[in-house]
Amino acid sequence: MNLSLSDLHRQVSRLVQQESGDCTGKLRGNVAANKETTFQGLTIASGARESEKVFAQTVLSHVANVVLTQEDTAKLLQSTVKHNLNNYDLRSVGNGNSVLVSLRSDQMTLQDAKVLLEAALRQESGARGHVSSHSHSALHAPGTPVREGLRSHLDPRTPPLPPRERPHTSGHHGAGEARATAPSTVSPYGPEARAELSSRLTTLRNTLAPATNDPRYLQACGGEKLNRFRDIQCCRQTAVRADLNANYIQVGNTRTIACQYPLQSQLESHFRMLAENRTPVLAVLASSSEIANQRFGMPDYFRQSGTYGSITVESKMTQQVGLGDGIMADMYTLTIREAGQKTISVPVVHVGNWPDQTAVSSEVTKALASLVDQTAETKRNMYESKGSSAVGDDSKLRPVIHCRAGVGRTAQLIGAMCMNDSRNSQLSVEDMVSQMRVQRNGIMVQKDEQLDVLIKLAEGQGRPLLNS
């Protein structure tokens, strides 16, 4: 039985009210909730049910060419944050609106389906009287061109999008133009593309802005201070420890831990995190002048030996490396000892003259990313040669990176490391920054200058700025 748009919406809305909207939908005649699990972004190959795929396909068949408002996309982004998975590729059509280009899995939550179906109903209602009777299969909002049918990997018969390694150069600002017009010659790295990227990332940042006692973010407990800055918080789902502002970050295939500069009260936990992670490199991007400023409360923990609770730390400087433009990296080795635990040695890369809320050049960023990657690889090889159980554990052997807040310089470096990894060749700048923001907080890549460096690195690789 093929459900009409109104029937599908009615059944989905009832289930959202009766069940959890986080359940995925399934369809065999009528819509039902898969109560056994919440959304995991599965495909048929990775464990999604055929009935889940049919549900997703059916919803998709009703939302082709549907224009999503900023409010619609904000609701989808809330789902992305909640599940730590982005299920949707959206394309801007101007004026803050978007269309759904593709679905990244064979599943869809009931709540997301409700958002999409309500957008379709709204557009259908608004289109009455504006389209002829023979065009009901391609309804579109007034003043908006009829766009190509929704491409979904669920339907192999539909034409594919252009390859990700060749950035899409048209269609982002085509509202009001006929489909037969010549292809746009707008540069994929020009002002229009940059403005669109900035707009999308700003929308995401606003969606992720923390409210008071926001359940999406880790909250301090036991009277201890958790965050250096009230607005720079730690995503609860990816938190490394309950007492640290530190997150597991995975951008494509690049896995790291991003954190704030530890508070004095957090040092024992911070060292324990470094040891348990078998940290292959600690990259400290906070400047020496910041550390020396007593008002900032930034303990000089990695350049000095000391005792922190039950943990004893020995620090030894090993070398200094020039990165270009006068930017220097001081190298240290931290030896962490705790009774009853293995002694752990952690290489440290400290960039002591990168000022807060600024960007170093793309050349310096590349050199720093390469130094951090090489240092980490050497240490990983050591653990592998010793048969360490940390090898193969995705939660361990991650570079730990922080500046002061852990969002600006930290994110610039993580983005560059991601682009250094050939396995991430299909990721756009939008992908990378969005994944960092969803997994830590909305301020990752804090300053425009830092985003500009990532854009320049992407342009040098022919990497797209925007999702297709």
From Swiss-Prot:
Biased composition (Low complexity): 130-141
Catalyzed reactions: O-phospho-L-tyrosyl-[protein] + H2O = L-tyrosyl-[protein] + phosphate
Gene3D superfamilies: Protein tyrosine phosphatase superfamily, Protein-tyrosine phosphatase, YopH, N-terminal domain
Domain of life of the organism encoding this protein: Bacteria
Top-level class of the enzyme under EC nomenclature: hydrolase
One GO MF term attached to the UniProt entry: protein tyrosine phosphatase activity
Cited Pfam families: Y_phosphatase (PF00102), YopH_N (PF09013)
Claim: Hydrolase is one of the keywords in the record: yes
GO cellular component, one term: extracellular region
Function: Essential virulence determinant. This protein is a protein tyrosine phosphatase. The essential function of YopH in Yersinia pathogenesis is host-protein dephosphorylation. It contributes to the ability of the bacteria to resist phagocytosis by peritoneal macrophages.
Family label: Belongs to the protein-tyrosine phosphatase family. Non-receptor class subfamily.
PANTHER family per record: RECEPTOR-TYPE TYROSINE-PROTEIN PHOSPHATASE, TYROSINE-PROTEIN PHOSPHATASE 1
The name this protein goes by in its record: Tyrosine-protein phosphatase YopH
Organism: Yersinia pseudotuberculosis serotype I (strain IP32953)
